[in-house]
Amino acid sequence: MKPRLIFIFFACYFLNFLPFSNQLPCSYQNPRIEDILLEVPIEHEHPHRHRRGLPSSDPTSPPVEKFAPLRIQLHYDKSIQNLTAEVQNFVNTTLLPEAVGYWENALRVRPMTTPIRLRRKCISSFYYYKQGMRNVACDKGCRERTTCGEADIPRDHLLDCLACNNTDDCKTTGELGEGVKDTDFILYVTAHDSKRCEGPETLSYAAHCQQEADFDRPIAGNVNLCPSALSVHNHDYEILTSTVKHEILHALGFSVGLYAFFRDSEGKPRTKRNRYGRPTSLNKQKGYYDWDSNTITTVLRENWWTGEGKVIHPIHMMVTPKVREEARRHFGCDKLEGAELENQGGEGTYLTHWEKRAYENEAMTGTHTQNPVYSRLTLAFLEDTGWYQPNYEVAEDLHWGKQLGCDFAMKSCGEWIHEKKILGEDAYPYCSDIKHDGSKSMAITRCTTQRDSLALCNLVPFQKELPSQYRNFMSLPGVNPDGAKYYGGSVEMADYCPFLQEFEWKLIDKTQHKDSRCELEGNGKEGEDILEVYGANSKCFEFPKPWTERKCGRIRVLSHYMAGCYEHQCTNGTLYVGSYNATDMYPCYAENQKIHIKKVVDGWLREGSLICPKCEDYCTNCGPPIVIPDYIGDPELDEPCSSNFKLSVLAFLCYLIFLHIRS
């Protein structure tokens, strides 16, 4: 029977896509200290400043500055040629130019006035450096090859080699390359199927490799694209471009290995320097220089709420001036110490991203989940490096946590959810609908905050008890009293906080790939249960109650659907909504107005209602409120049923009556 088959398919469908909820952790690894070359001699466009390395230089003196748009030079490694022609074309003409173009438009730097020539790597780790030298000198000469991440640096991009037996016995060997002119940063692009690419979640990774002498700004880096992860599929475009932009930003400055080199607004080091101009404390165990507390500090939250009582919870805060200002502005919390950094994820994620719980879909959090945006906070971070002047006009709006106040920014998500429940309020942006209990789907679709996609609450059971500081529930409906400590949001990096998350699903052979974004036409199928319309003009609308499907006395309640994607348009100050196979669009005159849809499709009567959002959420120009008619939607329709079926039912009922009379 159709209802049974559809229900079984629907349940299996939800269980099957659960493992594919979007979550791609960043694969960044801080480069080893020995792989980073500092003190690359350069010339900036500030004639009144002496370049460091000359006798009259003072590495802490403020510069006379002129900033100009960042110029990034792409240099493609020969490994790119191993990609298919279609993928090569995508990488060369779309993926890299778009990712690089974003940062060139977003950032200004002190421009280079001469070609960049990079340092050669020394044979040994010992070298000489003294005032008056143009270049760092190697004690045993230079290596044949100088690499930048996965890339070999062309000899034409390199300085000659200065080798010394002692500070007074030096000679120059090798050729002085022409360098790379008209650029401020060289990005070496590779496509090696490296060991780091073996994980199915790794799309690309990047890091810086050389820093200039005057201000310590990174001037060269490598981005490696994992060949098997590259796709020209429309559904993969957003995540690929966002990931490459994210990785490039690690090379430009968002790196735990660079915090100790940050400068203030006058160009002075934030972290104390030794007589050689380097940060004073090298943490060999962790592989980076330690920074001063004016950059990052640890704060103890002494009353961190959990479902089992309050605990002390340490957090790490970026406390530089612009970052603090933007964090306070975003949450509307004037007492917030700064912006929280990630405290989970291990090497490469810990401290090198924004905290996922606090800034969920900010693109510089440690894992991609949905709708990544580069917000004012990340641009403020770049300004506080002392290397960049950001263009805040390119910042994207971060809805997560916006203007939710100090309680949201400074307390656990468990306390936020608990207090909202007591008040009878929605726990936005968190949720408490269980996605599945480990054996069956309990998923219910909702709209994302931006109303551009369907989403599911990612609250799931784990096999082991959650860490005590991340037990965010005292109890959960339908879960035994001792079971709540096993439940949390599926994104561990978000402190196990549950939130609405977009989803996707693929066939094993990758012949089909769909996700929950309303804007992609390929995500929909004509005549599906709730009569959705996917496409460029579609948005997400929520339902006041589940849809139903009826035929001949049989009824199916589509309880998993509480939202869907529908076409919309703005006309004469009014928002209109369209469903599948509708001849006309339905007007939304006011927020929370209901639109009633009734259609006969494939012999079944489909019935459902949509809730109208604020007109301003979707339309630029909205008219004044009007009197809402009592009913807006389709006229009443009879439940389909063939005459033969009706006669059969009538005969069966008569037979039952006859048996009853006889008894």
Swiss-Prot record:
Q: Does the keyword Hydrolase apply?
A: yes
Active site residues of this protein: 247
Cellular component aspect of the GO annotation = cytoplasm; membrane
Residues where Zn(2+) binds: 246, 250, 353
InterPro entries per the UniProt record, alphabetical: Peptidase_M8
Q: According to its UniProt record, where is this protein mainly located?
A: cytoplasm
Q: Which cofactor does it need?
A: Zn(2+)
* Sorted UniProt keywords: Cell cycle, Cell division, Cytoplasm, Hydrolase, Metal-binding, Metalloprotease, Mitosis, Protease, Zinc
Annotated cofactor note: Binds 1 zinc ion per subunit.
* A GO biological-process term: cell division
Alphabetically, the GO molecular function entries are: metal ion binding; metalloendopeptidase activity; peptidase activity
A Pfam family hit:
Peptidase_M8
Report the subcellular localization: Cytoplasm
PANTHER family according to UniProt: LEISHMANOLYSIN-LIKE PEPTIDASE
What name does UniProt use for this protein? Answer: Leishmanolysin-like peptidase
**Native species:** Caenorhabditis elegans
- Biological classification of the source: Eukaryota, Metazoa, Ecdysozoa, Nematoda, Chromadorea
